[in-house]
Design a protein with these regions (language model features):
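Bacterial Sec-dependent N-terminal signal peptides
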Residues: 1-25
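C-terminal hydrophobic structural anchor segments
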Residues: 341-393
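Outer-membrane beta-barrel "beta-signal"
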Residues: 233-244, 382-386, 391, 410-423
Length: 423
């Protein structure tokens, strides 16, 4: 692994050799700058000073750690530049989208003890900072502190992703398509503020499991307060019958790590949002007339990876006993289900081809407001990995069909191109 400290060590050795050839005057010896790292009196001092310099690795950020190890800070950034073209059924261009879709800055590490871990993530594009009702800022994505007593348990307090469905748990930097599916876009729970806990049973290549849960405000990220008094309760169980994936491959789409043995994940989750005030629970517009609803969301995931081949399927849905509001508002809670299936193959850790089919099935009572009986989207994607998921180029093409659509002139085709760069 190539590291910047190696270059610093070579520079230091050269400078020491030069210093021996040219003796310093007494006046010059008094003018030693405090920041000079190449005038160490011994090899031990030099190595200690180099140890305090930041460590830079592509894909793993810039890490600072003092010699007393009382804290660690890793800084990362990433950006996604997107070009998307939409076409109608006659393949006439109807929309052009060209923008920086995501621009994120992330800080991770520990303070005081490696058992006290923190994570902060900020988003700066319009896609990341959708305005909240009341004008609250929406830049902060993650701001959480974890207590990690050992590799089995951890508990966190703050704002982060709700561990519900696999596609949402995955980072948007680790996708094998330009973006997540239409099913995930409708039903995911995104982020919230509250308490989070995890239990991870690890038994080598044998059976493993993880249990994750949270109690959160139920209103989504950066909401601040809830006048309803309701909370959201979420639990997820993950089973690994053949052992865990390499390098957290279960939260990275595709089989980039090239599993030598078959690896499988079967997971399920349920979330109950009591007195939610937004149409999608932790997301969406505010319900009209200060109304609230109780919502249940359910998720089932399956993953199989083996020697460059990957297969995923996600089933998820939402239930609400009273999804409709006054007709003049046009507001409704999207009751229904969605199914996503995708498969891919990786060639020589450079090229990947992937196919995805996603379908939304709104319940009959909300179909008139959703505008269709079901919505199917098929996507073909190609990815060129240059430095893994840290530097890659992606392109995909989607075709949409909506049965009994109220608006028959919807966009049928979509072609997208995206460049991702991260440190």
């Amino acid at each position: 692994m190539k590291k910047i400290p190696i270059l610093l060590l070579l520079t230091a050795c050269w400078s020491l050799a030069a210093a021996q050839e040219k003796p310093q005057t007494p006046a010059a010896q008094k003018r030693k700058p405090r920041t000079e790292i190449i005038a160490a009196d011994s090899t031990g001092e030099l190595l200690a000073q180099l140890r305090n310099m930041p460590n830079i690795e592509i894909g793993k950020g810039i890490t600072f750690r003092p010699k007393n190890d009382w804290f660690e800070l890793t800084m990362r950034f990433r950006m996604q530049n997107l070009l998307a073209l939409s076409f109608d059924d006659d393949f006439t261009l109807t929309k052009t989208e060209a923008r920086v879709k995501r621009l994120r800055l992330r800080f991770d590490g520990y303070i005081y003890s490696p058992k006290l871990v923190y994570s902060v993530q900020l988003g700066f594009t319009s896609y990341d900072t959708e305005p909240l009702p009341g004008g609250d800022m929406n830049i902060v994505r993650d701001a959480i502190v974890y207590y990690v007593p050992n590799a089995t348990w951890n508990i966190g307090f703050g704002q982060t992703k709700i561990k519900a469905n696999r596609a949402r748990i995955n980072s948007s930097s680790a996708l094998q398509f330009v973006d997540r599916s239409i099913v995930n876009s409708e039903f995911n729970l995104d982020r919230d503020f509250g308490f989070f806990g995890e239990y991870n049973m690890r038994h080598g290549e044998g059976f493993n499991l993880s249990a994750k849960g949270s109690v959160t405000l139920g209103e989504g990220r950066n909401w601040g307060s809830s006048p309803t008094g309701g909370l959201a309760y979420t639990g997820r169980l993950e089973l690994y019958p053949l052992g865990r994936f390499k390098s957290k491959g279960d939260v990275i789409e595709g089989n980039y790590e090239f599993e030598e043995r078959v690896k499988i994940l079967l997971a399920g989750a349920y979330s109950y949002n009591h007195k939610a005030s937004r149409l999608k629970g932790q997301r969406g517009a505010v319900m009209p007339g200060d109304a609230t609803r109780n919502m249940g969301s359910y998720f089932v995931d399956f993953i199989l990876e083996y020697r460059g081949f990957a297969f995923y399927t996600d089933f998820m849905g939402r239930s609400c006993s009273d999804p409709l509001f006054s007709p003049e508002t046009g507001a409704f809670v999207y009751n229904g289900q969605g199914l996503n299936v995708q498969t891919s193959y990786l060639f020589n850790k450079k090229w990947e081809i992937a196919l995805r089919n996603s379908t939304l099935f709104p319940d009959s009572e909300v179909q008139p407001l959703a505008g269709y009986r079901n919505w199917n989207q098929t996507t073909l994607g190609i990815t060129r990995y240059i430095i893994g998921h840290s530097l890659k180029v992606q392109a995909d093409m989607s075709y949409n069909t909506r049965s009994r659509s109220i608006h028959p002139d919807y966009n049928r085709w979509e072609i997208r191109f995206q460049l991702e760069l991260g440190l």
